[in-house]
Amino acid sequence: MQLNVNDAQAIEVSELTFGGEFNETLVHQAVVAYMAGGRQGTKQQKTRSDVAGGGKRPWRQKGTGRARAGTTRGPIWRGGGVTFAARPQDHSQKLNKKMYRAALRSILAELVRSDRLVVVQDFAVEAPKTKDLLNKLNGMGLSDVLIVSDAVDQNLYLAARNLPHVDVRDVQGSDPVSLIAYEKVLITVSAVKKFEELLG
């Protein structure tokens, strides 16, 4: 199949990588797994056994008329532990490499189908100036955009850093969430070739 390039002639690309069916279930699974992997999972609360003190029983077992109590750190006591205390946990989900690659192929194909993939021969700025990048993007009619190149250009990265709806990634740093989060994905021809190598 052919992909139109903004400032040059169309290029031939793999049907497998850029022309497959959209598998919504697989893409959803990949997005959930990616976001779950980003969770810290470090919150922790104290149970009755973690709270300091409470070793001595507050009153004797019998003869007081009060309910029996063996510690002052039980969950029903002020200053006591939490009943079902949160514990650190690993939220990450396993996703096979084959499935992850298939999800990325599915996303790329859908971007092509929905005219959200803008292919250019090359994309760079001469100096790390946000204004220069903004003018360049405005000239192309792009405001909410992910810029993907085969290697991150330092000037481009610094210029885009302060723009809220613009992000710069290389092919290796692209993930399912970032690829679908933006209105348009601006990608260089070299990045297209690299995606074909990785996902073909």
Curated annotation (Swiss-Prot):
GO terms for biological process: translation. Coiled coil: none annotated. Transmembrane segments: none annotated. Keywords: Ribonucleoprotein, Ribosomal protein, RNA-binding, rRNA-binding. GO terms for cellular component: ribonucleoprotein complex; ribosome. One of its GO terms (molecular function) is structural constituent of ribosome. InterPro entries: Ribosomal_uL4, Ribosomal_uL4-like, Ribosomal_uL4_dom_sf. SUPFAM superfamilies: Ribosomal protein L4 (SSF52166). Residues 38-72 are annotated as: Disordered. One of the primary rRNA binding proteins, this protein initially binds near the 5'-end of the 23S rRNA. It is important during the early stages of 50S assembly. It makes multiple contacts with different domains of the 23S rRNA in the assembled 50S subunit and ribosome. Forms part of the polypeptide exit tunnel. HAMAP family: Ribosomal_uL4_B. Belongs to the universal ribosomal protein uL4 family. Part of the 50S ribosomal subunit. This is Large ribosomal subunit protein uL4. It comes from Pseudomonas putida (strain ATCC 47054 / DSM 6125 / CFBP 8728 / NCIMB 11950 / KT2440). The lineage of its organism: Bacteria, Pseudomonadati, Pseudomonadota, Gammaproteobacteria, Pseudomonadales.
